[in-house]
């Protein structure tokens, strides 16, 4: 189910579907602000002949941190979630790393030294992303859609996603049905973290 409001957070690799209600004629800016910065960009929706005023590239205040307490995620509910089913396999996925040296890991290993997260095709899997670092990580799984089922130990019937944001020192559980037998990438979508090792594979066997 959707949220009503005028401001929504989004992590790297995520998407928003916006249903806008615009009254009458005029011009309406739809802006995106970068976390911790005054910089912003966006677009302007306008009816024919509307006056469009120039908007400064910098906002008045730094944009707030994104969903650091998972309050937005907690409000989200899937309109058509996964069928109810007991998990056949669970994996703890530990997210870690450091600024000095700048290295980011999954289950203590960088890409190339990783151990795959395994499943068999058709199994209901629960992945528990446990972030033990002081940076947030938008975790993305290729080839699958999962449903958020736990936030810091609290069971939820949450959103369906392919990228979920895991704030610092937090845990997010997601459930999915393992798809085609293949090696699917599982990684942080913050590119500097990905480039320094924060990737593993979700290995599905037949």
Language model features by range: what are they?
Residues 136, 146-181, 185-187, 193-206:
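C-terminal soluble interaction/assembly domains
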Residues 13, 142, 169:
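Short, conserved phosphate/pyrophosphate- and ester-handling motifs at nucleotide-, phospho-/glycolipid
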Residues 3-126, 133, 179-183, 190-206:
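Extended terminal and domain-junction accessory segments
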Residues 130-132, 142, 148:
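His-enriched metal-coordination microenvironments in redox/metal-binding proteins
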Residues 1-4, 157-159:
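Short amphipathic beta-strand starts and helix->beta connectors
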Residues 138-140:
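Beta-strand signatures of extracellular beta-sandwich domains
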């Amino acid at each position: 189910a959707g949220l009503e409001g005028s401001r929504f957070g989004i992590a790297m690799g995520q998407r928003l579907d916006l249903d806008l209600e615009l009254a009458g004629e005029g011009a309406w800016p739809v802006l995106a602000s970068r976390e911790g910065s005054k910089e912003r960009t966006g677009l302007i929706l306008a009816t024919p002949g509307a006056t469009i005023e120039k908007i400064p590239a910098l906002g008045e205040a730094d944009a707030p941190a994104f969903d650091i307490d998972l309050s937005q995620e907690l409000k989200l509910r899937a309109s058509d979630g996964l069928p109810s089913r007991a998990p056949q396999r669970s994996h703890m996925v530990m997210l870690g790393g450091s600024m000095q040296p700048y290295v980011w890991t999954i289950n203590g290993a960088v890409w190339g030294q990783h151990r795959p997260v395994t499943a068999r095709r058709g199994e209901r899997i629960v992945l528990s992303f446990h972030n033990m670092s002081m940076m947030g990580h938008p975790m993305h799984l290729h080839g699958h859609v999962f449903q958020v089922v736990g936030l810091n130990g609290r069971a939820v019937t949450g959103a369906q996603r392919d990228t979920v944001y895991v704030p610092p020192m937090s845990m997010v559980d997601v459930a999915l049905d393992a798809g085609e037998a293949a090696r699917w990438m599982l990684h942080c979508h913050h590119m500097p973290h990905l480039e320094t090792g924060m990737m593993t594979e979700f290995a599905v066997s037949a």
